[in-house]
Regions:
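Structured catalytic-domain cores with a bias toward divalent-metal coordination
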Residues: 1-194
């Protein structure tokens, strides 16, 4: 058991840190619990709503079910060195935001904050989960090369192939987490602007 018996005795916040197999921008995934959305919006990158309802068995689900403030930060592609800097920036910003440390004690805080806020410029601030393309190993799913997170897609656009043939976008939207690795149960997601 990792939490105090009385969860109200102090504020517990979970910042769940990740990278993805696809290239693209950093973003956050907020839950419907408490201040999750406000915490996620603080980082200045796009916020995805309702995605936690489509993905079960995650750390984010666990903390959300316990009604604790939690959100996920996706820093970028696994191999991108900038993902490390984005993660560091997210951690420092969150520590300041929840009152663990004062920003003036961090000499590079404004630079760290700028790292993420510059990424969020000219992008949709908040998007909502719309579609999940679930897969299983026997499907032999293969995403078409070149899709990035937050890339606009059109209804009918070829996205992937599997053992049954071509997979086309069921509607227009924004691509999220196209799968470019061997493991996973999610081929891709489609989100839409709120």
């Amino acid at each position: 058991y990792i939490l105090p018996d009385n969860k109200n005795s102090r504020r517990v916040v979970l910042l769940d840190l990740h990278t993805t197999s696809a290239e693209g921008i950093a973003y956050t995934i907020a839950t419907s619990t408490g201040g999750s959305r406000a915490l996620a919006e603080n980082l200045g990158v796009p916020v995805i709503l309702d995605l936690d309802k489509a993905i079960s068995g995650t750390t984010l689900n666990y903390f959300s079910e316990m009604e604790l403030e939690s959100f996920c930060f996706e820093a970028g592609q696994h191999e991108d060195e900038e993902s490390v800097m984005r993660t560091v920036s997210a951690i420092w910003q969150m520590l300041v935001h929840v009152g663990c440390i004062e920003s003036y004690k961090l000499p590079l805080f404004e630079d760290q904050k700028k790292v993420l806020h510059d990424l969020g410029k000219n992008l949709a601030g908040t998007v909502r989960y719309k579609y999940r393309h679930g897969i299983q190993p026997r499907d032999r799913f293969k995403m078409i090369a070149g899709f990035d997170n937050f890339q606009v897609i059109k209804k009918g656009q070829l996205l992937a192939h599997d053992r049954n043939g071509a997979i086309y976008a069921p509607f227009s939207g924004i691509m999220l987490m196209p799968l470019y690795q061997a493991q996973g149960k999610d081929g891709f997601f489609i989100v839409e602007e709120v």
